C-alpha cells in the first residue's frame, strides 16, 4: 500500500533545467534547535518514536545498538520511504501533473547517546557508522530503480539541522543530480581528473592530512573558509566497494577535519555530502573516477551575489586555510 500523503513532485526550471522537489510535509519536521525541546526520538530507549530499523550496528550488550538506519518520517523523495512503481505512478497522476520524485530517504542515527557532535563518538563506533552506510549503499546499488545515492550531514542550525542528536541522512534518487552530471562531464575531458586534483594540492601546499591512501585537501576554489575534500589517491567510483582500510581512513579523517575546524571556529556549523558515480545499472562506471566527501563549513551566509550569480566569495585563501587547519 502506498502512503496517504501526496507523493513528492519534481519540477524543473524552464531556463536552466534546475530540479526542485515539492514536499510540503517537510514543514512538519520537529525543530529542537529552535528551542522547542521535545523527547528526542534518536536516543536509546526511544526506539518506538522512529520507524523500524533498516540496518543496525549492534552493541556488546544484549539488545543495545551503536548506530541504526531508519526511514525518514519527513522524506524529500519517496513519500513513504520507498520507490513507487511506474504502474502506481501512472494510475495516480492527474493529467499534466509533474513527475513524482521517486527515491528513498533515510536517517542514520550515529549514536545512542544524546550528543551533538561526531567528536563525542568513540573512533571505533564512528568507523562502524561508516560501515553501516557502506552496507546500505551496497543494498541500494542492487536496486535498479535507484540511479544514484549519497550520505549527507547537516550539523548546526546554520547548516539546516532540525534535531540536535548527532545524525546524518542517506538518500537514493531515481535520477542523477545535476552536480554529478557536471562533475562527470568535467572529468571526461581529463585522463586523470582526480589525480590532477591531488597533484595540484600537493604542489600548492593544500594537503591537510592523510590516512591510508586517502587525502584531506582544501580545494583550489573553496566556497567557504576551510572547505575540505576527502578522497582516495587511486580510482574508486563507488563508496560501497571501498576496502576496510579506506573505510577506517575516511572515518578518522572526517573526525580529524571536524576537530580541526572546531578548534579554529568553535561550534562551527557545517555540511558534508558524499559524491560517488551513478550506479552501474544506470550508467557505465566512469574511468579513473574517485568518490569523495566534501565538507563545507557554514561560516558565511549566502546573499544576493552568491544566489544571483552562482559565484561564491571566501575570505580565506585555499593555501592559508590548509595551513591553519594543519596547525590546529
Descriptions of predicted regions:
Residues 240, 244-253:
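Gly/Ser/Thr-rich active-site loops/lids in small-molecule metabolic enzymes
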Residues 1-165, 171-238, 245, 258-263, ...:
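Active-site microenvironments that recognize anionic phosphate/pyrophosphate groups
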